C-alpha cells in the first residue's frame, strides 16, 4: 500500500557479519512474507553502491564504509573502479550500536536518581522505559547541542525527575565504546593489506555516525574528513534499490548501467580433517559467488565411508568454529588409507548460501548438502508449512482487515464531523446542529459497544450518518461559499482503485 502497488521481488540487506545461517533465515523470512528474494547483500556493500553513483571518479578508489547503526557495527573496505565494486575485507561487531550508548545514559541517570532520591528505578519497567525514551532523545540532541536537559514528570512514585547532561559527559560515559570502534577499522586495513594513507574516501553510514565524537575519531585516525554527503539513514536502502533495478533488468536510469557488484564471504568456510583440524576451502574475504574444490582421502585402511563436517570461522580447530552442517559419503570400496580420492566442492552463491558436495572419483558415489540443520535456519518443510498456513488463513485475514478498515473509516468520519461542528465556523440552524450532534453521539456510543461488529454493520451505520449529515453540511458549505470536504464517496473510490492495482 505504501508504494501504491504489489511488491513481488526484493533485494534484502543484512549486516556484513551475518553468517550463513542468519542469511538463510533472512531469505526464509522474505519467502514467508511472499517475496521472491533476488539477492541478499551486505549493508556496507549497498552503501557503496549509493556512494559509487554519487561520486564518479577516474581510476581505482579505496573506500572505507563505517556503518554504525542502532544495534550493529560494520566496517568494510571496498575498491571502486569503472563501475566495478569489490569488497576487499569486512569486520565489525554484531552487538554494538546506538542502543549501547542509550544504555550508558540510562545507567547514569538511574544512579543519579538513586543518589538524589534513594529510590531504585530498575524495579519499575514503565519508569525505565520512559527514562530510556528521554535518553535516546537527549543523545540525538547532543549531536547538535553542547548540552541538553531531561524533564520527566512523575517518573517514579510521584517524583519528578529534572536533570541535564553535557556532550562532554556523554562522551566520557561512552568513551570505551567509541574508542572500540577503531579496532575493526584497523583489522579491515590489515586484512586488505592496505595502509590507512591509501584510503581515498571514508563514508559514514548509520544514524549513530551523527555523533560528533565518532566523526572526530574517524577523521583523526585517517587524518582526513569523512564523507557525510550521503544521508546515513538512507544510504543502504538507496544502494539496495539500485541493485534491485539492476537485477530486475531496469536500465532506464543511466546510473544503473554497467555496474558490477562483487561481494565477499564474511568468514572462512571449510571442513574438518583428521585430528579436528579446520581445513578452509573458501577463505574469508573471497569474492562471491565462488566455487572451490579440493581432493581428500581416507584416514584409515579399508575405511567404508567419510563424514563431511562443514564449518565457518577463523580458528585452527573446528571445535572453536561454527558447525554449519554435516553429511556422510558411504560405499567407498576397501582400500589402503590415502588411496581413495574424495573430491569435496563448496559452491557459495551470491546470497552467501552454500551447497557442499562430495564424490568418490573411483566409484562415482556422491552426496551433497545445502546447509539446513543450523538452529537459526528453517527446513523446507517448515517453510512450506508456514506458507500453507498463510494461504489457509488468507481469506480470514483479508476479511478481518476489511472489517477493521470499515470500523476505522466510520470512527474517523464521525470524529472529523464532530470536530468540524464544534469549531463553529459553519452557519447552520440549531435544529440541524442538534440533529447531527445527536446522531454522532449515537454512532460513537454504538462504536464503543460494538468493537467486534461485522463490516456491513459499520457500513450501514456510516450510511445512516451520511444520510443526515451530507445535506446539512453541503448547505452549510454552500452558504459559506466553499466546497464541503470530500467524504466517503471519494475515499471509497480511491480505496477500490488501490485494491484493483494491488490485485
Curated annotation (Swiss-Prot):
Signal peptide: none annotated. Residues 475-503 are annotated as: Disordered. The keyword ATP-binding applies. The keyword ATP-binding applies. Keywords: Allergen, ATP-binding, Chaperone, Nucleotide-binding, Stress response. One of its GO terms (molecular function) is ATP binding. Residues 475-488 have a biased composition (Low complexity). Pfam families: HSP70. Belongs to the heat shock protein 70 family. PANTHER family: HEAT SHOCK PROTEIN 70KDA (PTHR19375). This is Heat shock 70 kDa protein. It comes from Penicillium citrinum. The lineage of its organism: Eukaryota, Fungi, Dikarya, Ascomycota, Pezizomycotina.
Amino acid at each position: 500500500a505504501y508504494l501504491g502497488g504489489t511488491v513481488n521481488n526484493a533485494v534484502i540487506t543484512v549486516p556484513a557479519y551475518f553468517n550463513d545461517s542468519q542469511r538463510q533465515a533472512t531469505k526464509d523470512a522474505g519467502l514467508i512474507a511472499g517475496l521472491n528474494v533476488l539477492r541478499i547483500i551486505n549493508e556496507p556493500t549497498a552503501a557503496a553502491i549509493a556512494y559509487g553513483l554519487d561520486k564518479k571518479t577516474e581510476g581505482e578508489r579505496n573506500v572505507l564504509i563505517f556503518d554504525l547503526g542502532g544495534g550493529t557495527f560494520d566496517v568494510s573496505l571496498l575498491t571502486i573502479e569503472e563501475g566495478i565494486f569489490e569488497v576487499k575485507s569486512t569486520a565489525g561487531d554484531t552487538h554494538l550500536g546506538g542502543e549501547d550508548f542509550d544504555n550508558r545514559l540510562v545507567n547514569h541517570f538511574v544512579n543519579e536518581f538513586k543518589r538524589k532520591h534513594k529510590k531504585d528505578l530498575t524495579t519499575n519497567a514503565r519508569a525505565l522505559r520512559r527514562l530510556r525514551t528521554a535518553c535516546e532523545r537527549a543523545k540525538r540532541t547532543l549531536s547538535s547541542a553542547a548540552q541538553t536537559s531531561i524533564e520527566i514528570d512523575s517518573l517514579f512514585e510521584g517524583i519528578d525527575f529534572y536533570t541535564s547532561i553535557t556532550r562532554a559527559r556523554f562522551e566520557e560515559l561512552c568513551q570505551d565504546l567509541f574508542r572500540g570502534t577503531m579496532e575493526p577499522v584497523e583489522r579491515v586495513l590489515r586484512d586488505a593489506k592496505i595502509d590507512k594513507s591509501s584510503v581515498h574516501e571514508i563514508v559514514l553510514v548509520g544514524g549513530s555516525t551523527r555523533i560528533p565524537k565518532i566523526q572526530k575519531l574517524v577523521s583523526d585516525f585517517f587524518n582526513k574528513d569523512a564523507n557525510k554527503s550521503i544521508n546515513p539513514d538512507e544510504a543502504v536502502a538507496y544502494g539496495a534499490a539500485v541493485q534491485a533495478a539492476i537485477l530486475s533488468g531496469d536500465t532506464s536510469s543511466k546510473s544503473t548501467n554497467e555496474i558490477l557488484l562483487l561481494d565477499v564471504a564474511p568468514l572462512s568456510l571449510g571442513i574438518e580433517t583428521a585430528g579436528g583440524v579446520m581445513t578452509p576451502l573458501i577463505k574469508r574475504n573471497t569474492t562471491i559467488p565462488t566455487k572451490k574444490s579440493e581432493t581428500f582421502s581416507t584416514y584409515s585402511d579399508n575405511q567404508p565411508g567419510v563424514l563431511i563436517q562443514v564449518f565457518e570461522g577463523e580458528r585452527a580447530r573446528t571445535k572453536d568454529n561454527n558447525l554449519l552442517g554435516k553429511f556422510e559419503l558411504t560405499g567407498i570400496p576397501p582400500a589402503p588409507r590415502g588411496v581413495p580420492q574424495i573430491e569435496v566442492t563448496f559452491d557459495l552463491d551470491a546470497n552467501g548460501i552454500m551447497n557442499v558436495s562430495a564424490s568418490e572419483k573411483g566409484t562415482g558415489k556422491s552426496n551433497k548438502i545445502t546447509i539446513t540443520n543450523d538452529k537459526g535456519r528453517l527446513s523446507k518443510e517448515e517453510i512450506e508449512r508456514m506458507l500453507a498456513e498463510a494461504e489457509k488463513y488468507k481469506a480470514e485475514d483479508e476479511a478481518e482487515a476489511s472489517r477493521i478498515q470499515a470500523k476505522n473509516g466510520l470512527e474517523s468520519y464521525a470524529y472529523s464531523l464532530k470536530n468540524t461542528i464544534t469549531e463553529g465556523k459553519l452557519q447552520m440552524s440549531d435544529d440541524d446542529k442538534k440533529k447531527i450532534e445527536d446522531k454522532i453521539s449515537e454512532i460513537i456510543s454504538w462504536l464503543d459497544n460494538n468493537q467486534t461488529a461485522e463490516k456491513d454493520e459499520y457500513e450501514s451505520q456510516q450510511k445512516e450518518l451520511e444520510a443526515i449529515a451530507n445535506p446539512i453540511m453541503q448547505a452549510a458549505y454552500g452558504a459559506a461559499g466553499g466546497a464541503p470536504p470530500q467524504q466517503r464517496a471519494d475515499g471509497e473510490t480511491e480505496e477500490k482503485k488501490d485494491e484493483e492495482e494491488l490485485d
